[in-house]
Amino acid sequence: MVAFATEKKQDLNLLSKIASGDGHGENSSYFDGWKAYEENPFHPIDRPDGVIQMGLAENQLCGDLMRKWVLKHPEASICTSEGVNQFSDIAIFQDYHGLPEFRQAVAKFMEKTRNNKVKFDPDRIVMSGGATGAHETVAFCLANPGDGFLVPTPYYPGFDRDLRWRTGVNLVPVTCHSSNGFKITVEALEAAYENARKSNIPVKGLLVTNPSNPLGTTLDRECLKSLVNFTNDKGIHLIADEIYAATTFGQSEFISVAEVIEEIEDCNRDLIHIVYSLSKDMGLPGLRVGIVYSYNDRVVQIARKMSSFGLVSSQTQHLIAKMLSDEEFVDEFIRESKLRLAARHAEITTGLDGLGIGWLKAKAGLFLWMDLRNLLKTATFDSETELWRVIVHQVKLNVSPGGSFHCHEPGWFRVCFANMDHKTMETALERIRVFTSQLEEETKPMAATTMMAKKKKKCWQSNLRLSFSDTRRFDDGFFSPHSPVPPSPLVRAQT
């Protein structure tokens, strides 16, 4: 055993600190949930007791529209008889700037997803291998190792990888609270900025996600103006991640930072940068189309040089240029995507409402922010992790705990709803129903004891076993005799 440990240490010494370190961030419950799914993925026929993937923020609701367009336009691919005549032109080495028709089509699409209220210059578009590569490129352009970016919480766990791992940049959390719907306030920004200063971390920028992942909320005009003014006053950069721009639905409105800076007099646009991609709005994460759009000429020049490490293939550029130039298709796709997202959101929220499960009111994104604080043994992240393990390994739903999103309050979970078909969603809701109904059955006999004890303590037992057979029961001792007994053990969030 000692020899093995020594050998392993020697192997690590052969590698760089970046390669052998844990900066990737994969040692978190966010990625552990993915591992549980990969080991036992749900399939309605082959693996009906498998884990349902609700931890993947992917838009699969309009795949039929995408397939229909591809079949109708074989000339968009250089690997078909209709498009092969362009093979030689596309397959040869291309400029790092990207195909002109690709940049023009992307700029037009970005305008359309922002209700044509702003214009984007194709010459300011820098391509990258997905939003992951785009974020890292921005970090390399704006910050040195040891510098920091302010990031409002909760935020996407992948930022720890995208912005920190290879750049050496620090992420400084801006603490937001459920009491005001996790809104970003100037007071919270000032507090985080001061904390960074006390920790000797030079703050180089503020990164915000709009619409928010994981909240599904959008930033209103006044909030965006306050963010622009804050960063301008501090002389730091504002990076707006807008990759969910076209996922709003219902009465929700997306306002881009590009629109707001037009309304602010004397705004220093050199400090404004946008990260975008086609992964969420078009449901094309596998094509790895990421975009850096900067109003800073120098950043555009530097980012273009850095893009050589993560270019979008010319074949993909060619396909995307053809697709996004079809305005009739794009209009139909965006319209239908919003309708289907609204319908799926209504389906899952109606189901949760019927079970008394709370969620943060929001109308954007491919997920919702579920409130299970009332089920925690104690208001700690250890209790949150304990509950999460039950949900993943017993209920067999891979939802992501708030702690992995750096949420300040334990008990929140992100639940993705657009990456599955209708029947799988029904199965997921049924599992939640079974879960909650059995909790009620377990707590009812304990009501008298609970009233006499007059205690409000909850207790998760590690020996919980769920069954989705007709018997459907829990092991004895799931709740302690001191558990409170509301009409449902889950309560709606007051947000």
From Swiss-Prot:
How is activity affected by pH?
A: Optimum pH is 7.3.
**Positions of modified residues (N6-(pyridoxal phosphate)lysine):** 280
Please tell me in which tissues this protein is expressed: Expressed in roots and flowers.
Q: Which residues bind substrate?
A: 58, 96
Q: In which pathway does it act?
A: Alkene biosynthesis; ethylene biosynthesis via S-adenosyl-L-methionine; ethylene from S-adenosyl-L-methionine: step 1/2
Resulting phenotype, residue 483 to D: 40-fold increase in ethylene production
**Modifications after synthesis and translation:** Phosphorylated on serine residue by MAP kinase (MPK6). May be processed at its C-terminus.
As recorded in UniProt, coiled-coil segments are none
One term of GO molecular function: identical protein binding
Classification via InterPro entries? Aminotransferase_I/II_large, Ethylene_sulfur-biosynth, NHTrfase_class1_PyrdxlP-BS, PyrdxlP-dep_Trfase, PyrdxlP-dep_Trfase_major, PyrdxlP-dep_Trfase_small
* Induction / repression: By indole-3-acetic acid (IAA) and cycloheximide (CHX). By auxin. By treatment with ozone.
Family note: Belongs to the class-I pyridoxal-phosphate-dependent aminotransferase family.
Other known facts: The stability of ACS proteins, and the regulation of such stability, play a central role in ethylene biosynthesis. The phosphorylation of serine residues on the C-terminus increases protein stability.
Q: What is this protein called?
A: 1-aminocyclopropane-1-carboxylate synthase 6
Q: Which organism is it from?
A: Arabidopsis thaliana
Taxonomy of origin reads: Eukaryota, Viridiplantae, Streptophyta, Embryophyta, Tracheophyta
